[in-house]
């Protein structure tokens, strides 16, 4: 017997699947087989918890729990192969593999049970019928008739679904699905329509209704007079087009060149959604330095002046909790506060999320980026002025927030578009035009040259930036001097030459402190204005042959800007009154 046991163990070892590398695909496996194999391998190594939610021993619904992350997912087992099973985890929803580590873990546990081989050989044959969503290459609705399915329902299903392809619903028959669901629900037969399938159907219906409603509201499209009167300032034609595009898409990426007015397009879309599509809560997420800029422009463009029209979220946790409890139309927060405030945001439940300066989140695997993807909303508008076509990893992550299914699974996209050397190092990208076509339904991007004829000769834009605590100290110190001199002047009706000089100097110092403390002490550099300026350069210089001219009254302002340009490796020339006349022609 001992010899027999050793022989069985030896045979088991020989038949064990080889360990797969997570970074290099085996030559004898396709990318799909490799990715499925990785999930099978990883799932069977886990120590998850498993709970059967029904009395069925194999073809049942289970709860798979991960004690490490304290997360749990619903798993439905319908067979051994990919496609028919289901898991509520994000990987299953987006990988297009028809499996995940939770499904593979569950299968591994079930296969060890007595009767598993016979049960899986017989296959899944439930008494009830079900409508479900499959995502093994493309998301599609499927129908599976139960053993007790009435003949009338079977006949209706045969006319609607392609029973030769696992009950798949053809694209041209989605408009007939609602009546079928109604019929099945009233048949007296147990009919299950799962949430993910119903959500998918609802999303398609909502898109159709939005398009129909927009055509009714603005029959002339971007040229419709109703759009020109939408805000307190008239929209340029391309801005009206962008606003309509964002509303029609529901979740959209606006990637126009810097300076073309992405903010006003987002506010216009926000107004359309609020007036005609039931949006009552809007969350704006932007860099800290732009929060008050957003508040100012929402009030200016929309004409709303009440306190709850646009509230900036500031302060400690207690203050932010109080702010999120208030019944505001719009709340404005910054990236750094997303993770600690996720529970507050979820409780407030925004209908629309606007994400500004998305390109500033350089690493979309950061805490803030992961937190952003956990915010749930019916509508979303992402604004970025930087071209992302050649930054594939950043583009993937941004698009995942807008529409996690649009680009397909990351593993597949990188396999199709990354160019690697023999060592597996990424050396470039290929086929990027195909990505642009895939993104067309959710992404709009106009270059300045394309809309130049619609623009005035000059566009003025004032950007508000906050002052640091040290800047405020210098500013207030000089403001106190000004107040004392003015008070004495009003009292005596006389201003001495000394006081005139002190007054002028203090006012000048107040202005200089708004740039940076460096202008006053030549030692410290407290201030965000120069950093914001160079951040704008990052966007501007992403375009070839772009140039910028910066004017300042003070050469010390030039000095702090130059330091930042040199740190980024950006070329520049500096022209001021101290440049000798013989060197000026070269500049």
Predicted regions and their residues:
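Conserved helix/coil segment N-terminal to the catalytic DExD/H
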Residues: 275, 317-352, 363-367
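Charged, low-complexity
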Residues: 2-5, 28-30, 54, 117-252, ...
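Hydrophobic anchor at the beta1->P-loop junction of P-loop NTPases
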Residues: 89, 254, 550
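Short Cys/His-based metal-binding microdomains
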Residues: 69-122
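Conserved SF1/SF2 helicase motif Ia
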Residues: 253-260, 265-297, 379, 544
């Amino acid at each position: 017997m001992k010899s027999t046991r050793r022989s069985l163990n030896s045979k088991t070892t020989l038949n064990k699947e080889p360990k797969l590398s997570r970074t290099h695909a085996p030559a004898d496996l396709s990318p799909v087989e490799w990715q499925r194999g990785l999930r099978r391998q990883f799932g069977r190594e886990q120590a998850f918890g498993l709970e059967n939610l029904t009395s069925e021993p194999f073809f049942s619904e289970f709860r798979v729990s991960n004690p490490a992350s304290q997360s749990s997912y619903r798993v439905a087992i319908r067979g051994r192969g990919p496609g028919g099973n289901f898991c509520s985890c994000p990987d299953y929803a987006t990988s297009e593999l028809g499996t995940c580590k939770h499904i593979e873990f569950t299968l591994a546990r079930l296969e060890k049970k007595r009767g598993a081989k016979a049960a899986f050989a017989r296959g899944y044959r439930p008494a009830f019928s079900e409508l479900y969503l499959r995502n093994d290459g493309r998301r599609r609705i499927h129908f599976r008739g139960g053993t007790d399915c009435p003949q009338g329902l079977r006949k209706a299903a045969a006319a609607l679904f392609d029973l030769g392809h696992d009950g798949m619903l053809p694209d041209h028959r989605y408009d007939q699905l609602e009546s079928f669901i109604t019929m099945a629900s009233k048949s007296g037969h147990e009919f299950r329509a799962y949430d993910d399938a119903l959500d998918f159907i609802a999303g398609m219906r909502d898109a159709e209704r939005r398009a129909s409603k927009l055509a009714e509201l603005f029959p002339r499209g971007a040229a419709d007079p109703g759009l020109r009167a939408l805000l307190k300032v008239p929209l340029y034609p391309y801005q009206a087009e962008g606003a309509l595009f964002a509303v029609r898409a529901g979740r959209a990426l606006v990637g126009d060149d810097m300076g073309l007015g992405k903010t006003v397009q987002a506010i216009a879309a926000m107004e359309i959604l609020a007036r005609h599509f039931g949006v009552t809560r809007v969350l704006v997420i932007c860099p800290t330095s732009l929060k008050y800029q957003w508040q100012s422009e929402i009030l200016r463009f929309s004409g709303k002046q009440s306190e709850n029209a646009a509230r900036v979220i500031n302060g400690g946790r207690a203050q932010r909790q109080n702010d999120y409890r208030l019944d505001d139309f719009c709340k404005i927060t910054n990236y750094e506060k997303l993770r600690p405030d996720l529970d507050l945001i979820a409780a407030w439940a925004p209908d629309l999320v606007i994400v500004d300066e998305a390109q500033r989140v350089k690493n979309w695997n950061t805490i803030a980026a992961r937190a952003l993807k956990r915010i749930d909303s019916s509508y979303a508008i992402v604004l970025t002025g930087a071209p992302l076509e050649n930054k594939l990893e950043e583009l993937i992550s941004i698009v995942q927030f807008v529409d996690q299914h649009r680009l397909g699974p990351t593993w597949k996209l990188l396999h199709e578009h990354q160019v690697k050397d023999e060592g597996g190092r990424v050396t470039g990208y290929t086929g990027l035009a195909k990505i642009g076509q895939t993104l067309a339904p959710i992404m709009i991007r106009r270059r300045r040259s394309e809309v130049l004829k619609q623009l005035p000769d000059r566009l003025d834009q004032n950007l508000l930036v906050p002052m640091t605590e040290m800047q405020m100290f210098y500013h207030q110190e000089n403001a106190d001097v000004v107040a004392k001199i003015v008070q004495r002047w009003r009292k005596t009706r006389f201003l001495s030459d000394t006081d005139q000089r002190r007054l002028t100097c203090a006012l000048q110092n107040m202005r200089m402190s708004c740039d940076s403390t460096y202008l006053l002490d030549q030692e410290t550099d407290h201030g965000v204005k120069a950093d914001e300026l160079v951040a704008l350069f990052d966007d501007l210089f992403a375009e070839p042959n772009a140039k910028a001219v910066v004017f300042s009254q003070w050469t010390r302002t030039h000095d702090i800007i130059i330091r930042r340009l040199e740190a980024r490796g950006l070329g520049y020339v500096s022209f001021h009154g101290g440049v000798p006349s013989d060197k000026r022609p070269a500049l």
